[in-house]
């Protein structure tokens, strides 16, 4: 009796493991059958049978379980290597669990109680070989870098190339993109690849503007400060402006516009609460510029002089309650002569909109005589939304000078009182680029609402959407336009600020415009005419839109691009074989014909997703080295059209980029979601984010490295370097160091522009989804500054921090 009891106890462990294997096999069998019926891989069905039978044999105490498990593990290893090669993160869901169970089966407590006619050394040996082979595959994968490009820039300058951006002191950062050209290039050289590792915190300032219960989920700290006029100017999500001492971070003055909820109970229902920046205008900068003044208008001339004298240096603040406010940059007091006691009400001639449904999240463009502003329009609410009009005001008086409405593009004469701009015309919510020498403003354009249905779009709205339009600064008339997505059904707004630089080409130096896009193309055109510098090809695109809509037969693609390969079933990922299998089932259940697969009732995969390869963070360039520094991200989304009769039952939407979007007035609402596993992880395999550099003289990628860790986005804070998405921009320096803070983990990082080597990282107290900047303080020290306030949509930690770093003394 005691012998039987001991035998039962000794078989307990293999029996329990057998039950577990059998249950896993049954679960995989159900999913495997589903996947096969969808035309997917046979592996999961066959592996389910093998692992399930191994479990049953273990429960029966049969030694044959080891031999069968060895066969299935060996076959799984061969299959995994055939699918993905030596890619560690791709091998994890395919082999890690089965490898671990194989090791457990080799333990004496699990294998010794087993009996049968098979030789114990043979079955144990076979399993040992299978385990070793799987382990060797995992070990070998540690020495590979799939998706990366290793290279080195072989120059510090291209002969004859200079920085032709608007002049300013080297130590200043006067515009959102440092200059109106949006290049984000600083001529500072104190920080170099040799000393960047010595960067340390210099000071920290807290704005006090922290998201509260009454704020929208998409409350974001996306501000890039300005350093000019001996001060550092910051704006906060609730449109406060704070002037800081650039050396110490101490507050000099603060302006709070006390934004209105626009008759709502609070801000919670708003799509966004964002201020990406303010704009600066200095009369002295134009003092030597010839001006044209009309002797016939002495009153206007006198008013301009009065405004200039009272606010010779001014900041322009777009507020979340739809105002444009002019502030004295020295004191923070409003410039009373601008508009109505310092403010222009941007609601004029716009018509009705929901609270928070229209305002500028981005800084206006400022020229010698004008301040020019666009506006954010909440996506996918209805077909009756505010106009995307661009308005130019006198920089001193706030008088409307011209307006360009893409729904009425020929008439730029200031609109009459009582009239309304074209409803629902394509808008420009991002940042302008300006070339005052050429007399042009460059607009990165969005599209007509809703994003995923275009059956009722007008000819004008189609013409000017999802591309770049160049306007004459003085008149607002169109000089040229280029479209980068035809009949956009995927929310492929041009989100980033266009970048202006002189580019060395085979035909000589040309004034270029670079437009980074969500699709991954970087379009390079002559900014005088819009003609190609880098070839742009029209490629066939998938068809088959829903009834009432259509697709464009072709879509443009630049020869300079960071477009990822099309997804396949084998690209689906998970932590375990089970969530990976479910992702494969999801992939095969959705429509996917490659990039530009149209939205569908079935549900379609959008890849790259509407966060883009490049979003509003854009790119930075080094005009001397003739390179671009990039932070591409790769995340798939899904887009499922829903008949309007079903939309109301689905409840309110979660946000502007997820959940059901009502699209009132259109035949369909739409459900937008990232393509995630049941565990909330991306269904596509990592890496999801990189840093890269492109040689603009030949359009070759010099280097490309995965970037960022999952430390702050996984349940266990382990800094696994998987390459995570980033949202926000970069900047480069003459010292050869580039900076980025927008990754999902809370770090500001420095990189060697020659080879992409990470030189340093500084821990941030909150998410850094913004664009950092650099300047020289009054003490002659180079500082790097970033706002760390988090991003609601990405779920990064919220805060109210401005952090400055410098080299250790």
Regions from the language model: what does each represent?
Residues 1-152:
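Topology signature of small-to-medium multi-pass alpha-helical membrane proteins
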Residues 83, 170-212:
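Extracytoplasmic/periplasmic/luminal assembly and interaction segments
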Residues 131, 135-170, 192-196, 201, ...:
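N-terminal amphipathic, basic-rich helices that act as targeting or association modules
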Residues 137-188, 552-563, 567-576, 656:
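N-terminal pre-domain segments of enzymes
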Residues 173-176, 218-238, 269-323, 356-382, ...:
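Repeat-blade elements of multi-bladed beta-propeller folds
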Residues 180-186, 209-215, 242, 451-452, ...:
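Short, solvent-exposed loop/turn elements at domain surfaces
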Residues 197-210, 241-269, 280, 285-291, ...:
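Extracytoplasmic/lumenal domain signature
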Residues 433, 555-637, 645-646, 659, ...:
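Long, low-complexity segments enriched in small/aliphatic residues
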């Amino acid at each position: 009796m005691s012998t039987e009891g001991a035998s039962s106890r000794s078989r307990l462990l293999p029996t329990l493991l057998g039950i577990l294997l059998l249950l896993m096999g049954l679960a995989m069998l159900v999913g495997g059958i589903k996947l096969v019926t969808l035309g997917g891989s046979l592996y999961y069905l066959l592996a389910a049978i093998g692992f399930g039978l191994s479990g049953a044999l273990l429960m029966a105490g049969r030694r044959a379980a080891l031999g069968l498990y060895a066969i299935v593990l060996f076959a799984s290893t061969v299959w995994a290597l055939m699918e993905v090669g030596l890619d560690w993160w791709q091998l994890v869901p395919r082999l890690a669990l089965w490898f671990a169970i194989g090791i457990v089966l080799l333990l004496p407590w699990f294998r010794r109680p087993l009996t049968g006619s098979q030789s114990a050394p043979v079955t144990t040996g076979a399993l040992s070989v299978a385990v070793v082979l799987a382990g060797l595959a995992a070990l070998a994968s540690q020495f590979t870098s799939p998706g990366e490009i290793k290279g080195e820039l072989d120059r510090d300058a291209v002969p004859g190339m200079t920085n032709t951006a608007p002049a300013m002191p080297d130590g200043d950062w006067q515009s959102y993109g440092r200059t109106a050209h949006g290049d984000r290039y600083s001529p500072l050289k104190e920080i170099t690849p040799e000393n960047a590792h010595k960067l340390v915190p210099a000071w920290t300032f807290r704005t006090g503007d922290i998201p509260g219960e009454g704020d929208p989920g998409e409350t974001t700290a996306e501000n890039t400060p300005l350093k000019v006029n001996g001060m550092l100017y910051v704006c906060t999500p609730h449109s406060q402006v704070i002037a800081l001492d650039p050396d110490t971070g101490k507050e000099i003055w603060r302006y709070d516009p006390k934004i209105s909820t626009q008759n709502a109970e609070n801000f919670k229902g708003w799509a966004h609460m964002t201020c990406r920046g303010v704009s600066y205008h200095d009369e002295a900068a134009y003092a030597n510029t010839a001006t044209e003044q009309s002797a016939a208008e002495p009153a206007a001339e006198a008013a301009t002089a009065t405004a200039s004298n009272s606010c010779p240096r001014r900041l322009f603040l777009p507020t979340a309650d739809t105002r444009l406010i002019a502030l004295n940059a020295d004191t923070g007091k409003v410039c009373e002569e601008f508009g109505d006691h310092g403010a222009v009400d941007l609601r004029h001639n716009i018509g009705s909109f929901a609270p928070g449904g229209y305002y500028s999240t981005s800084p206006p463009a400022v020229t010698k005589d004008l301040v020019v502003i666009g506006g954010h329009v909440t996506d996918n609410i209805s077909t009756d939304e505010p106009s995307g009009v661009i308005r130019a005001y006198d920089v001193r008086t706030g008088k409307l000078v011209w307006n360009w409405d893409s729904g009425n593009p020929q008439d730029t004469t200031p609109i009459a009182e009582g009239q309304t701009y074209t409803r629902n015309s394509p808008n420009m919510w991002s940042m302008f680029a300006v070339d005052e020498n050429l007399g042009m403003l460059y607009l990165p354009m969005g599209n007509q609402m809703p994003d995923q249905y275009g059956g009722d779009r007008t000819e004008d709205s189609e013409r000017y959407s999802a591309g770049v339009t160049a306007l004459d600064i003085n008149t607002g008339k169109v000089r040229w336009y280029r479209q980068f997505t035809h009949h956009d059904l995927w929310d492929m707004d041009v989100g980033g600020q266009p970048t202006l630089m002189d580019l060395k080409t085979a035909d000589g130096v040309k004034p270029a415009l670079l437009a980074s896009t969500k699709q991954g193309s970087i379009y390079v055109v002559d900014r005088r005419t819009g003609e190609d510098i880098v070839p742009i090809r029209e490629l066939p695109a998938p068809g088959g839109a829903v009834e009432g809509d259509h697709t464009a037969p072709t879509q443009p693609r630049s020869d300079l691009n960071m477009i990822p390969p099309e997804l396949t079933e084998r690209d689906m990922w998970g932590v375990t074989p089970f969530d990976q299998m479910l992702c494969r089932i999801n992939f095969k259940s959705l429509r996917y014909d490659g990039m530009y697969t149209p939205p569908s009732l079935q549900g379609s995969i959008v890849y790259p997703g509407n966060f883009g390869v490049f979003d509003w963070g854009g790119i930075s360039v080094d005009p001397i080295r003739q390179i671009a520094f990039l932070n591409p991200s790769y995340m798939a989304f899904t887009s499922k059209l829903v008949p309007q009769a079903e939309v109301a039952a689905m409840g309110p939407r979660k946000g502007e980029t997820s959940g059901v979007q009502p699209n009132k007035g259109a035949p369909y609402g739409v459900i937008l979601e990232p393509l995630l596993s049941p565990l909330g992880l991306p269904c596509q395999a990592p890496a999801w984010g990189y840093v890269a550099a492109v040689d603009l003289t030949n359009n070759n990628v010099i280097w490309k490295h995965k970037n960022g860790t999952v430390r702050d986005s996984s349940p266990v804070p382990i800094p696994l370097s998987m390459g995570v998405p980033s949202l926000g921009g970069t900047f480069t320096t003459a010292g050869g160091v580039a900076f980025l803070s927008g990754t999902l983990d809370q770090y500001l990082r420095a990189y060697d522009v020659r080879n992409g080597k990470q030189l340093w990282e500084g821990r941030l107290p909150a998410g850094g989804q913004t664009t950092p900047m650099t300047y020289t303080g009054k003490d002659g020290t180079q500082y790097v500054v970033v706002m760390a306030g988090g991003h609601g949509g990405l779920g990064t930690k919220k805060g109210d921090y401005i952090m400055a770093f410098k080299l250790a003394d």
